[in-house]
Amino acid sequence: LTIPGEGSVSAMSWTDVTATNFYFDTKDYPGLVGVSFEANMRLANGNGYGYVRLFDVTNGIAVTGSENNTNSQSSVWTKSQEVYFWAGKNLIRVQAKSLTADTTVYSQGRLRIVTEN
């Protein structure tokens, strides 16, 4: 599942990445075995680490297991641990931050969804 949007964040606290909203409902995937979040990202100056995660706007929580990070100045694909969504049709968006004042650049993302079927 491709996640829309891209953007950059120069903040040390979690900040929404513009236009990355999408809806996700586990019921839409019968036989769901697991989900991971893959993000193409980089850290503009390689100063510290850049982070991205998924945020469940509907329930006001970070999506468990969804955090990715890199210290690369070149765009790289990163992969989260297994991601756990709350039940129901939830509005999800990408958030980003860095541990320094460097800029985290999020280029694209996707959910890798594994089902039994």
Question: Where are each of the predicted segments found?
Answer:
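Extracellular jelly-roll beta-sandwich "head" domains, especially the C-terminal globular C1q domain
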Residues: L1-N117
